[in-house]
Design a protein with these regions (language model features):
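Active-site-proximal, well-structured secondary-structure segments within enzyme catalytic domains
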Residues: 93-104
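Generic non-transmembrane alpha-helical segments
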Residues: 74-85, 122-130, 170-178
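ATP/Mg2+-dependent ligation/transfer catalytic cores
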Residues: 1-94, 132
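Short, conserved charged micro-motifs
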Residues: 10-12, 114, 160-164, 242-243
Length: 256
């Protein structure tokens, strides 16, 4: 990754990373869940949709078998390439819609955002070698199909080792107060995805809850079971969100 500078070596106005790097220290841990669709480069349709709309969702998520999964060899090649580069991908899985996939990318500090950007680049490059496209739009297919998000798990030192129910709930309340500002930075066309359906909260509303996949912020069972030491999951960011902007916002908005 490189930063953009002007001819006089000052930070270019488009360089959001410089400001983020000053506040997003290694105390902050991020786990990005990057969702996307593999696509036919000629038609733009998701892989597996060549003969029309496939059967409804239900058997594709973490599925096995040629009738349930397409693109696994590409996902596996991407995983191996990222690991060789030192990018910590912690897992992959077929997602809810046919042709939709996810990988999880973990990192500390601003490197988390850098690694997600590089992993996206590698995803497009490796898919190209297979003659396949990639779509990270948050709602490539309308109708009764899940969109694609960038659910983000995050924590700082206090959350991991000095947590309490009061701390986590106060963080959620604070995030609720700046919900509109956050949404503006969570990717384009996110209103098509955050409808209140398909495991989302409405874009105009904010909520949080324990193990609630329909909430804006999910408090994981892991956190509760570890005496309120752990992390939060922000389910609002779209699959095309900028991880640099996200980490910068999080370091500002979540602090007491």
């Amino acid at each position: 990754m490189t930063q953009v500078h002007a001819a006089d070596h000052t930070t270019h106005p488009s360089n959001f990373r410089a400001a983020a790097a000053e506040v997003v220290t290694d105390e902050w841990w991020f786990g990005f869940e990057q969702e996307f669709f593999f696509t036919d480069p000629k038609t733009g349709e998701p892989l597996g949709w060549e003969d029309g709309t496939p059967r409804e969702q239900g058997e594709y998520y973490c599925g096995v078998g040629a009738s349930n999964v397409v693109g696994r060899e590409i996902s596996d090649a991407h995983l191996e390439a990222c690991l060789e580069l030192g990018i910590t991908l912690t897992g992959t899985n077929a997602e809810v819609a046919l042709g939709q996939w996810e990988y999880q990318c973990f990192g500390k500090g601003i490197k988390a955002a850098d690694d997600l950007w590089v992993s996206r680049y590698m995803l497009f490059k490796i898919a190209e070698e297979f003659g396949v496209g990639v779509n990270i739009h948050p709602k490539p297919k309308t109708g009764d199909w899940n969109g694609s998000g960038m659910h983000t798990n995050f924590s700082n030192e206090e959350m991991r080792s000095k947590g309490s129910k009061e701390l986590f709930e106060s963080m959620c309340e604070k995030l609720g107060k700046v919900h509109e500002d956050g949404i503006a930075s969570y990717g384009s066309d996110n209103d098509m995805r955050l409808t209140g359906l398909h495991e989302t909260q409405k874009i105009t509303e904010f909520s949080y809850g324990v193990s609630d996949r329909g909430a804006s912020i999910r408090i994981p069972v892991y956190t509760v079971e570890h005496d309120w030491n752990g992390y939060l999951e922000d389910r609002r960011p779209a699959s095309n969100a900028d991880p640099v902007s996200y980490t910068h916002l999080r370091a500002h908005e979540t602090l007491p």
